[in-house]
């Protein structure tokens, strides 16, 4: 039985919607990759390795971070939008050096705060900073 014009029109519309969805998904992936590259350039670190460190160091035990399932803690502040904040811990200007320092040795910056010092190299702290910046 031949297809009616209505069926052909519906078929073409469905194909157009699928093509649009694929294009939108591709643009989102490209935007995420661009954000990660920009974050790595700013922080001088490797965001992919920073994501591994985020899990290994147990950051999600105290903090939440959208898109990271193991980040469900309620002790520390949410880490969404760290790259958009003006200050770190309400005391330090938000720049890669200060964020990396805060990650490594928060007790030196604000003695007695709830965040423990995290033994790691300066490069590892830059990698973790790049990961946080890459999340927005």
What positions do the PLM features span?
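Short cysteine clusters
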Residues: 59-62
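Hydrophobic membrane-insertion alpha-helices, especially the h-region
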Residues: 9-25
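Extracytoplasmic electron-transfer domains, predominantly the class I c-type cytochrome c fold
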Residues: 70-136
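Short, Lys/Arg-rich N-terminal segment immediately upstream of the first membrane anchor
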Residues: 1-6
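Cys/His-rich metal-chelating microdomains
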Residues: 65-68
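Electrostatic cytochrome c docking/interface patches
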Residues: 29-55
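Residue-level signal for short amphipathic helical patches enriched in basic/charged
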Residues: 54-57, 110
């Amino acid at each position: 039985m031949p297809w009616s014009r209505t069926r052909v029109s519906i078929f073409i519309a469905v194909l157009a919607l699928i093509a649009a969805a694929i294009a939108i998904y591709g643009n989102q992936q490209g935007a995420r990759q661009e954000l990660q590259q920009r974050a790595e350039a700013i922080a001088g670190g490797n965001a992919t390795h920073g994501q591994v460190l985020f899990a290994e160091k147990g950051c999600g035990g105290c903090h939440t971070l959208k898109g990271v399932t193991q980040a469900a803690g309620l002790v520390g502040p949410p880490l969404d939008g760290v790259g958009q904040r003006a200050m770190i811990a309400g005391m330090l200007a938000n720049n890669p050096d200060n964020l990396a320092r805060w990650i490594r040795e928060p007790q030196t910056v604000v003695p007695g705060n709830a965040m423990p010092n995290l033994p790691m190299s300066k490069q590892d702290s830059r990698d973790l900073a790049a990961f946080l910046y890459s999340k927005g």
